[in-house]
Design a protein with these regions (language model features):
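Short low-complexity, flexible loop/linker segments enriched in glycine and/or proline
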Residues: 126-129, 184-185, 279-281
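Extended hydrophobic/aromatic segments used for targeting, binding, or gating
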Residues: 262-286
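Short, charged, surface-exposed secondary-structure boundary motifs
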Residues: 56-62, 121-124, 140, 213-214, ...
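Thiolate-centered catalytic microenvironments shared by cysteine-dependent enzyme domains
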Residues: 2-7, 64-164, 180-181, 196, ...
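Terminal peptide-recognition signature
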Residues: 18, 47, 103, 121, ...
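Positively charged, proline/Ser/Thr-rich regional signature most characteristic
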Residues: 3-82, 157-230, 234-235
Length: 286
């Protein structure tokens, strides 16, 4: 199978495609990384930097920015309502998918991911620059309300899925799922009081969806993982979660764009909300 076999092949572009569109005024290349300082060491020519924490999250309440703030972020980066935004970043595009998902919360649907992310671009010896682009501010319409309902899940939604047996997938590492650790093995074990998983959740680590070079696996391989291995189907109401929502946004992208599932929501509160919540039920082990 080729990339064209994905449900929405237009949402995933190659490094070659990006290289050919670096100067396309209708396209804005957006870098979003876990390491927020990485952009300054070198980035794709013309790419803007969107900091997942400083630019997309409310700085007081645990939530996202409001529609007016989102419009301001887009405006200062030369992004209009019809601009094609191509996201890429480190960590096999965790944070690129996260940023794309947040853009979708505000109704910006013309979005794509660069397959393989930053690492693939660098491995191919493609150009990087430290020069920061300057784009003229553009007018971006302000939504009356952020569109959370379609693709975002909250504690109550995850709890309902847990109690009713609806599909709930935990995309963290197996050790996190079993409750042996509260973060990935190579990270500080902090930020959450209890380890384990939401009762009824299935463990499907995000990493099963990518190849060693960070590119996405074929549709046939993904179908084996999610449709056959987890008994998921495009018509089911699915909630995915991780620790803070970034890894589960990667899985959300896979299910939504590559497999064409219609009802997938990302529970961005994830384990740092569930594992810290008083009396929230917790399961451990496999």
């Amino acid at each position: 199978m080729s990339q064209k076999d994905y449900a929405h092949p237009e949402a995933l572009v190659s490094t070659e495609w990006v290289a050919a569109h670096l100067d396309d005024p209708s396209v804005r290349i957006v870098e979003s990384n876990e390491d927020v300082l990485l952009y300054d060491t070198g980035h794709l020519p013309g790419a803007v930097h969107i900091d997942w924490r400083a630019d997309l999250q409310d700085q007081t309440v645990r939530d996202y920015i409001d529609p007016a703030e989102f419009a301001a972020v887009c405006s200062k980066n030369g992004i209009g309502p019809d601009t094609t935004c191509v996201f890429y970043g480190d960590k096999s595009n965790w944070w690129a998918c996260y940023a794309l998902w947040v853009f979708r919360l505000f109704g910006h649907n013309n979005v794509k991911i660069m397959n393989g992310g930053r690492d693939k671009w660098v491995a191919e010896g493609r150009p990087l620059t430290r020069e920061k682009p300057r784009y003229a501010p553009v007018e971006y319409p302000v939504l009356s309300v952020r569109r959370d309902a379609e693709i975002r899940a909250f504690f109550e939604d995850a709890d309902q899925h847990s109690k009713s047996g609806l599909p709930l997938i935990d995309v963290r590492s197996p050790g996190e799922f079993r409750g042996e650790i509260t973060h990935m093995p190579e990270y500080p074990q902090e930020g959450v009081l209890r380890g384990g998983h939401v009762p009824g959740a299935k463990s499907v680590p995000w990493k099963t969806a990518v190849n060693d070079d960070g590119t996405f696996k074929s549709r046939e391989e993904l179908e084996k993982i999610y449709t056959q291995g987890c008994a998921l189907s495009p018509d089911k109401d699915i909630v995915a979660y991780c620790r803070i929502g970034e890894r589960s946004s990667h899985t959300w992208f896979v299910l939504t764009y590559l497999l064409g599932y219609k009802n997938v929501r990302n529970y961005d509160g994830s384990w740092t909300e569930w594992g810290n919540r008083v009396r929230a039920p917790i399961a451990r082990g496999e």
